[in-house]
């Protein structure tokens, strides 16, 4: 016999022989194959998907509501901006109006000063009309009951009688309102 006819030793090591075969434990219970019911699997999957669908639908509805709320807030803010668009300009013009009123308070002695005062009065009247056209009005103060949202008490004086308590007795600087907002409170003297 030639060498090729006999199997190599390494080939023999891999062969399974009766003495090398895995031994079965006679006491071990036979393996039971667990067969799952396919209907139960589908029912579980349907229940999981239904719950997930409800969760996603809830998230969608919440997102939709949030978008609607954002749109409503945006519309409200925009309406506020449009409503009060002249507010900053009015605040800038008020000191100029105060200066014109101070100029008119000075007594004019000669004819040239009186003519100048007339021009200042016309300018002030024009500004006041423009302010009223935009919804800016003077806050009524003298003789009114003190209101901290409209008046700023700069000084207090003793009341002459009980009727005048908490009443504005003198206006030091006019206050103005723009629609329903106070642009500048009136600086007043209040009786206590």
Curated annotation (Swiss-Prot):
Q: Which GO terms describe its molecular function?
A: adenyl-nucleotide exchange factor activity; protein homodimerization activity; protein-folding chaperone binding; unfolded protein binding
The record, for Gene3D superfamilies, names:
3.90.20.20, Head domain of nucleotide exchange factor GrpE
Q: Tell me which PROSITE patterns the record gives.
A: GRPE (PS01071)
Q: Which Pfam families match?
A: GrpE
Q: Name one GO cellular component term.
A: cytoplasm
Instruction: Provide the residue span(s) of the region labelled Disordered.
Output: 1-41
Keyword tags:
Chaperone, Cytoplasm, Stress response
Subcellular location(s) of the protein: Cytoplasm
Q: What is this protein called?
A: Protein GrpE
List the taxonomic lineage: Bacteria, Bacillati, Bacillota, Bacilli, Lactobacillales
């Amino acid at each position: 016999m030639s060498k090729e006819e006999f199997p190599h030793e390494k080939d023999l090591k891999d062969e399974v022989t009766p003495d090398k075969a895995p031994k079965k434990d006679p006491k071990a219970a036979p393996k039971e194959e667990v067969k799952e019911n396919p209907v139960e699997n589908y029912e579980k999957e349907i229940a999981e998907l239904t719950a997930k669908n409800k969760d996603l639908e809830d998230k969608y509805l919440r997102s939709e509501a949030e978008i609607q709320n954002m749109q409503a807030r945006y519309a409200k803010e925009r309406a506020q901006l449009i409503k009060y668009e002249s507010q900053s300009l009015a605040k800038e013009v008020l000191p100029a109006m105060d200066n014109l009123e101070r100029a008119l308070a000075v007594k004019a002695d000669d004819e040239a000063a009186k003519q100048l005062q007339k021009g200042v009065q016309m300018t002030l009247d024009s500004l006041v009309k423009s302010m009223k056209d935009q919804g800016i009005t003077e806050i009524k103060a003298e003789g009114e009951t003190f209101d901290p949202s409209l008046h700023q008490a700069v000084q207090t004086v003793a009341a002459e009688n009980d009727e005048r308590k908490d009443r504005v007795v003198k206006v030091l600087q006019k206050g103005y309102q723009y629609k329903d907002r106070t642009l500048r409170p009136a600086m007043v003297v209040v009786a206590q």
